Amino acid sequence: MQIIEGKLQLQGNERVAILTSRFNHIITDRLKEGAMDCFKRHGGDEKLLDIVLVPGAYELPLILDKLLESEKYDGVCVLGAIIRGGTPHFDYVSAEATKGIASAMLKYSMPVSFGVLTTDNIEQAIERAGSKAGNKGFEAMSTLIELLSLCQTLKG
């Protein structure tokens, strides 16, 4: 039996984009910082890292599709923060963003990590953006790094 898994180390030549929504920027800025930190700590070259900003989480799938279609990137780390309010808006935005991101990843068969927070309140978002629950941006980039390695291994 063979166990195949990705390594948490970049070669240093991977071109990566961090796609981030600006809405709830107090949270998403911290997620982005965590992702950038992880990229650098695990051998990424800052010159090969692009930050792409969109207005909100609903716009993430369209721009992710454009980034993957361009074939400019080896992978994309997608970040955002959708916080539940008093209307069903949260449900619509989170469902469509999630479906759209997964759809683009499968359409192009490219490594994409999902770091879009969906929380019931601002406190939960803050916890996941660098306090009690760690930084989910850092975790999303870690996932992307492993995916990049695993895809390269499976490619042969």
From Swiss-Prot:
It holds the Pfam family DMRL_synthase. Pathway: Cofactor biosynthesis; riboflavin biosynthesis; riboflavin from 2-hydroxy-3-oxobutyl phosphate and 5-amino-6-(D-ribitylamino)uracil: step 1/2. GO terms for biological process: riboflavin biosynthetic process. One of its GO terms (cellular component) is cytosol. InterPro entries: LS, LS/RS, LS/RS_sf. Keywords: Riboflavin biosynthesis, Transferase. 5-amino-6-(D-ribitylamino)uracil binds at residues 23, 57-59, 81-83, 114. Its EC number is 2.5.1.78. CDD domains: Lumazine_synthase-I. PANTHER family: 6,7-DIMETHYL-8-RIBITYLLUMAZINE SYNTHASE, 6,7-DIMETHYL-8-RIBITYLLUMAZINE SYNTHASE DMRL SYNTHASE LUMAZINE SYNTHASE. HAMAP family: Lumazine_synth (MF_00178). Catalyzes the formation of 6,7-dimethyl-8-ribityllumazine by condensation of 5-amino-6-(D-ribitylamino)uracil with 3,4-dihydroxy-2-butanone 4-phosphate. This is the penultimate step in the biosynthesis of riboflavin. This is 6,7-dimethyl-8-ribityllumazine synthase.
